[in-house]
């Protein structure tokens, strides 16, 4: 007895594709416009910012990796965050970490602006006129991660 496949070769192809992707999970969607930036990105970002303010790279690699992992859950618009975080994780010294942190900060700022997201409560966005880059930080006293102790209060808050 022969079996007839209902739907023909195209249907079989679709079934095979569906079966192959059964274990696949679609990336999470970006936060709704007008929402709050994901804490999974912001919390490790703030740890990196604090380390750079202290003229240190302790914990930068691990926290940048956490940012990259979190960014992958935000969907396609966050690909620049993921890429910048991975570059920061590979930084070999303080100067390079600060440079890559600037790239990451710009990527996050662009993502947040594009989706009209705000930082979580208590987190503010600041801007350094010397490097022309933003950063996020806790608290109301400027703590510039691009220059650390040499120019700790250089910059201004945007929000």
What are these regions (language model features)?
Residues 2-16:
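Bacterial N-terminal signal peptides that target proteins for export
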Residues 19-23:
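C-terminal motif of bacterial Sec signal peptides marking the signal peptidase cleavage site
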Residues 25-27:
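Bacterial signal peptide processing site
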Residues 29-33:
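Compositionally biased, proline/threonine/alanine/serine-rich low-complexity intrinsically disordered stretches
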Residues 34-159:
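Mature extracytoplasmic or organellar-lumen-exposed domains after removal of signal/transit peptides
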């Amino acid at each position: 007895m022969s079996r007839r496949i209902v739907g023909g070769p195209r249907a079989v192809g679709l079934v095979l594709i569906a079966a192959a992707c059964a274990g696949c999970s679609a990336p999470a969607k970006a936060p709704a416009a007008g929402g709050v930036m994901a804490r999974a990105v912001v919390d490790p970002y703030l740890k990196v910012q604090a380390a750079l303010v202290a003229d240190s790279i302790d914990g930068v690699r691990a926290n940048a990796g956490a940012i990259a992992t979190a960014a992958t859950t935000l969907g396609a618009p966050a690909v620049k965050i993921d890429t910048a975080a991975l570059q920061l994780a590979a930084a070999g010294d303080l100067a390079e970490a600060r440079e890559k942190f600037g790239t990451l900060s710009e990527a996050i700022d662009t993502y947040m602006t594009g989706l009209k997201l705000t930082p979580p409560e208590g987190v503010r966005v600041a801007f350094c006129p010397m490097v022309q880059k933003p950063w996020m930080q806790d608290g109301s006293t400027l703590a510039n991660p691009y220059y650390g102790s040499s120019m700790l209060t250089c910059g201004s808050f945007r929000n």
